[in-house]
Amino acid sequence: MTTPSKSSNKRFRDNESEVDETGSQIEKQVNATASTSTSRPALSSHESEGSSVMKTKKKKKAQTPGIVFISRVPPGMTPQKIRHLMGRWGDIGKVYAQRRDAPGGYNPNSANQKKQKHASANFTEAWVEFLDKSVAKTVASMLNAQVIGGKKGDRWRDDIWTMRYLSGFKWEMLGEQIAYERQAHQARLRTEITRAKTEQNEYLKNVELARTLEKRKAKKAAAGGPSESAPNQDAHSRSYKQRNVVEKPKTLEGQGMDGVLNNIFG
């Protein structure tokens, strides 16, 4: 058997050292990748926090709004004042107030009424949209039939709220309702206009007929013929059966007294 030489032993040792160095380098790379992999969850935690914030924002945006109907608006109160008073209880989206002389609330007797000083702020009813329907429910149940309140000397301090929550009612439905009321108002106006025209035409026909009859009467009176009023009077006159007047004969007593007087003064 041949024994290995010193040079071959050195080469073998050099190869072993190179293998150890490459193995240590591989281990370092593996450890580095492991450290990077362990550092990634920290980033994912930030991403999870960001996603949770986005979810909360989406939840806030996804809140279903609720609408409160105010059946009576105090005189002189404007939509801006309603928004200010209702904004104390929650976030408000839209506010709509209907005027007293609006097409939806047409009053035929309003034409004869005198205009008030603050006619521009004369509203009958209002709709308030809360961004959260739970807030709308609590506000409607809490403020209904309650005094408005406020500082001493406020105009609506002693006035009372009359409101209720409209379940299942959306703001788009309000627009449809207002459009329907306007169409109904226009239809009522058209019917009233046509009725007034027919009454006016009938009146003018009667006036023209009366004029023609008067002209005929005047012509007949000028020609000397019998007027049309005479037969009408005879037709309407009534005849009653009269009894003949019977003279009563003088009594004997009356004759005797006459004879005595004649004898005395005769």
Swiss-Prot record:
One of its GO terms (cellular component) is nucleolus. The keyword rRNA processing applies. One of its GO terms (biological process) is endonucleolytic cleavage in 5'-ETS of tricistronic rRNA transcript (SSU-rRNA, 5.8S rRNA, LSU-rRNA). This is Pre-rRNA-processing protein ESF2. Belongs to the ESF2/ABP1 family. Its main location: nucleus. Keywords: Nucleus, Ribosome biogenesis, RNA-binding, rRNA processing. Residues 221-231 have a biased composition (Low complexity). Involved in the small subunit (SSU) processome assembly and function, and in the 18S rRNA synthesis. Required for the early cleavages at sites A0, A1 and A2. It comes from Cryptococcus neoformans var. neoformans serotype D (strain JEC21 / ATCC MYA-565) (Filobasidiella neoformans). Residues 66-160 form the RRM domain. It is found in: Nucleus, Nucleolus. Residues 22-42 have a biased composition (Polar residues). Residues 1-74, 215-259 are annotated as: Disordered. GO terms for molecular function: RNA binding. It comes from the Eukaryota. Coiled coil: none annotated. The keyword Protein transport does not apply.
